[in-house]
């Protein structure tokens, strides 16, 4: 399947290719930004696939690709002989697409949302509002992020996410300096939420639950 692009309501761009699904918004030179986003997106999956065996191994040897290096840097603080760079893949992809947009186009505000892991670009008076909800979709309020805040990445991980989690948390959300850093931290926190030896928790090897996992 080839990379797909479509425009959504609210002047948003939808990009998809295999497991990668992005929702993108931009204020400013939007058309130029969207063209840059798609041009960069076209090769993302192939780049990651080329180094996937290494990225699924515990953090160690430095990968070559630009996105893979973002993943490696974000995962490095958590290197323990088990953790892999895949803990930061969604955030790193979002961050890379946003970087391509801001390099090409003058933007006051932009975001790239990769399945809930979000890379942000904010300047001047621009803000980004994050809605907070409970697992049963009860509205718990909002958080406004401004350009003066040291936050450019938001990520959520847990049992309800797209990837397997080693923990039992419904969701853990992290705000950080970059999307890849937020993704890595949220993944690790989600993995750490556990009740050892609880009789209502069933444990099994990850590869018996999903055959494409890197969790073993």
Predicted regions mapped to residue ranges:
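Conserved mixed alpha/beta catalytic, RNA-binding, or beta-rich assembly cores of soluble enzyme
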Residues: 114-215
């Amino acid at each position: 399947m080839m990379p797909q692009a479509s425009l959504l309501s609210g002047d948003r761009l939808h990009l998809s290719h295999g497991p990668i699904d992005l929702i993108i918004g931009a204020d400013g030179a939007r058309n130029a930004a969207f063209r840059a986003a798609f041009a960069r997106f076209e090769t993302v999956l192939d780049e990651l696939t080329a180094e996937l065996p290494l990225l699924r191994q515990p953090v160690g040897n430095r990968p070559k690709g630009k996105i893979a290096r973002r993943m490696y840097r974000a995962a490095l603080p958590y290197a323990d002989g088990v953790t892999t760079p895949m803990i930061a893949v969604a955030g790193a992809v979002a961050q890379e697409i946003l970087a391509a947009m801001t390099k090409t186009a003058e933007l006051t505000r932009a975001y790239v949302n990769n399945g809930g892991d979000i890379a942000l670009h904010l300047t001047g008076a621009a803000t980004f509002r994050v809605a907070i909800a409970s697992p049963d979709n009860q509205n718990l309020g909002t958080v406004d992020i401004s350009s003066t805040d040291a936050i450019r990445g938001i990520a959520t991980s847990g049992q309800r996410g797209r990837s397997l989690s080693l923990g039992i948390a419904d969701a853990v959300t992290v705000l950080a300096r970059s999307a890849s850093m937020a993704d890595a931290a949220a993944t690790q926190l989600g993995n750490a939420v556990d009740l050892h030896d609880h009789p209502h928790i069933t444990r099994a090897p990850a590869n018996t639950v999903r055959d494409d996992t890197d969790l073993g």
